[in-house]
Amino acid sequence: VGVTWVQPRQNSVEALCYGINHFDGVEFDLRLTTDGELVLHHDNTTKDDNYVELLSSNEMKPFADKFDDLLARKDFTNPWQEQGKTVCIELKSPHPSSGIGGGWRGGSKRVEYISSMVKMVDDAISQFELPEGTTVLYSFDKKFLPAVKAAGWQHPKARLMPTLREWGSGNLQRAIAAPSFIAHSLPRLMRKHQKWGAPMIPCTLDYLHGMNRHLTLGTSVSLTGKGLEKLTKARKGFPAFVWPVRVPHEKLILDAGLTALTDDSSPKITHLPGGSPRITRPASEPLFDGQHIPWHEMTNDSRKELLSAQRKRWQWGRSVDELLDSTNENQIPWEVPRIIGHRGAGKTNFK
C-alpha cells in the first residue's frame, strides 16, 4: 500500500467504517451521556479521569464520537444492510462510583438504566432494513438479560461471561473474573448461553489456547488434536466469538470453525507468519471454486454448496435446509467463521 496507514482511535466512526469494510464485521462499545446521547467509548473514564456517564455529549466530543454519527455513514450502514456483515454492540454499564444507574446498589435502577440504553439502540437502528442475524447486542452486566426483556429487544442478544466488573484495574478485573472462568468450562458455558437464547458465545482465547485451558472444571478443549475434536463435537456449530486473536493464531481459530476478534487491522498485513495469504473476510468474501467471491454476489446454489461443505467439515447441528432458511444475499448464518474488527480497527492505547 503506497499510502501510510495510521490506525484510527478505537471505537471512532473512522475505525468502524474501516473495520466493517476490511473485515466480516465489527464490535464496538456504547455508553450514555448525561443528555441522553449514545457515544462510542470503551473505558468508564475519559483520559481526564472523568466518568463518561457524568459528562454531556458536548463534553465527550474530544474523546468519543456519537452513535448517530456512525449511523449517518453510508460506508458503514450499506455493508451492514447489504453485504451480510456482522455488528456486535456492547453496552457498557456506568462505574458504580459515578452514582449513575443505582451506583453501588444497582438493583432495579440498574435494570432501568440498561433498558433505556437498549431502547435507544433499538430506535436508532429501526430506520434500517437490517437482515435477521446481522446484529447482536451484549453486555457483561448481570442485569443485562432482564433489561433486554423489559425493553422488548427483538434482535439476538448475549450476556458476556466471565463477568469483568466495570471497576478496578485490568488485573483486578481479571482476578475477580477468575472464579467464574474456572467454574465454567467452554461446553458448559455454551449450554448456558443457548439457554439464554444467545446466537453465539463470546469467549476468551484462554479457553482454547495455552495452559489456562486446563484450569476450568469440566471438559477441557483446545484448537488442535483431540481437544479440537471434543470442541467441534460439543459445539455442533454453536458459534464461539474468540478474543483477543493475534495474526499468528488466526488460521488456527478459523480452521477450528470459530470466529476471531482481531486488533490487527493494518492493510499492510497481507500474509500470515507461515507465508500464506491473510484472509480478512472469510465469511463475507469466502473462497469458493478457487476465488474469493463476495457473499452477496454468490448464486443461491453456490451458497448452498459452500454451506454444505462447511456443515460437514465442522459437524454443524442444523440441516442444510435450516441453514438456507437463515440465509440470503444479505445474511450469513451464525455458524460461518468470521473475522471481526475489535473496536473497529483494533484496540488503541489512546482513549
Write out the residue ranges for each language-model feature:
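Phosphate-group recognition and catalysis centered on beta-loop-alpha active-site segments
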Residues: 1-351
